[in-house]
Each structure stands twice: as C-alpha cells, then as structure tokens.
C-alpha cells in the first residue's frame, strides 16, 4: 500500500525522526519518495552499493 507524503511526515515527526542522525525531516521525506514512492511494500536491495 502507499502512504501519502503528509501521512509519512506526520508519523516520522511523531517518531522523532527530524534530526535523527543529523537527517532533517525534509530529507527523510525526499529519501522515502525516491526509494519507494511511499510504497510500504517496496524493498530496495541496493545491489552492490
């Protein structure tokens, strides 16, 4: 299933992800958007990277 961007941001903020390991909430949203398009079933294997 897919989350909406604002839904993800709200949950991430509630889980104190803003600033986690120096990563801003905006950067987490960007990362999730690019890696999975907010698809909760997506798996990225990072082949050799």
Swiss-Prot record:
Q: Where in the cell is it found?
A: Secreted
Catalysed reaction(s)?
Hydrolysis of (1->4)-beta-linkages between N-acetylmuramic acid and N-acetyl-D-glucosamine residues in a peptidoglycan and between N-acetyl-D-glucosamine residues in chitodextrins
Tell me one GO biological process term: defense response to Gram-negative bacterium
What are the alphabetically sorted keywords of the record?
Answer: Antimicrobial, Bacteriolytic enzyme, Glycosidase, Hydrolase, Milk protein, Secreted
Q: Give residue ranges for domain C-type lysozyme.
A: 1-49
Active site positions: 35
Q: How does it assemble?
A: Monomer.
**Stated role:** Lysozymes have primarily a bacteriolytic function; those in tissues and body fluids are associated with the monocyte-macrophage system and enhance the activity of immunoagents.
The record's misc note reads:
Lysozyme C is capable of both hydrolysis and transglycosylation; it also shows a slight esterase activity. It acts rapidly on both peptide-substituted and unsubstituted peptidoglycan, and slowly on chitin oligosaccharides.
**Name the record gives this protein:** Lysozyme C
Write the lineage as a comma-separated list.
Eukaryota, Metazoa, Chordata, Craniata, Vertebrata
